[in-house]
Amino acid sequence: MLVRNAQLQVVSTQPLIARLLEDALHARLPEFPAVSLVLDWPVGFAFQMVTPESAASSFVLTQNACPEYLDDLWNLGLLGLAYRSRTLEELAELLRRAETRERVRLTPAQRSPLTPAEGDLLRLVSRGLANKEIARELGIANQTVQNGLTRVFQKLGVSSRNEAILYYWDIANKPPIQ
């Protein structure tokens, strides 16, 4: 619901940017929904800040175009997820839509080539887990992890664990998203 004089919270590692963005959005929305706008910079910041309790009232704005990363953010149960910079008017419109609690996802249409199980492997590798830790976490055999990672590397066109990690965190050289 829209709340007059409620505080829109912009969550960022840069307090000045957060304050300026809050002021600019308040000027465009005299009444605004009670939501948190999380600026996912550096990449991964949103995973630290969004909790299961806060996800349903959180919008995340990210620069990471990795489809698996975007899916992982969305699967937190976010109210909204947007890729790349938006104009202040676009951000204000996203926040207006929050009144209905309609989930909004404005991300590239590119879909992951990975199965859900392979996506789990990529996510855990990208968080620094070793194969044995991944096997324990997923309740599968170490050899299953190794075989699965081989398929992940093939599908992503990477040749190593390190390249897969760089891909997930959107640091690898990839073709630009349109």
Give the ranges of each region predicted by the language model.
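N-terminal regulatory/sensing modules of transcriptional regulators
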Residues: 1-105
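Short secondary-structure boundary/hinge segments and terminal tails
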Residues: 91-92, 153, 171
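Residues within well-ordered alpha-helical secondary structure of globular protein domains
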Residues: 97, 127, 170-171
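Hydrophobic patch in the ABC ATPase nucleotide-binding domain
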Residues: 100, 114, 158
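Short, polar/charged, Gly/Pro-enriched helix-capping and turn/loop motifs at alpha-helix termini
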Residues: 105-109, 159, 178
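Helix-turn-helix DNA-binding segment
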Residues: 105-144
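Recognition helix of helix-turn-helix DNA-binding domains
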Residues: 128-163, 167
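…primarily DNA-binding HTH/wHTH and HhH modules…
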Residues: 171-178
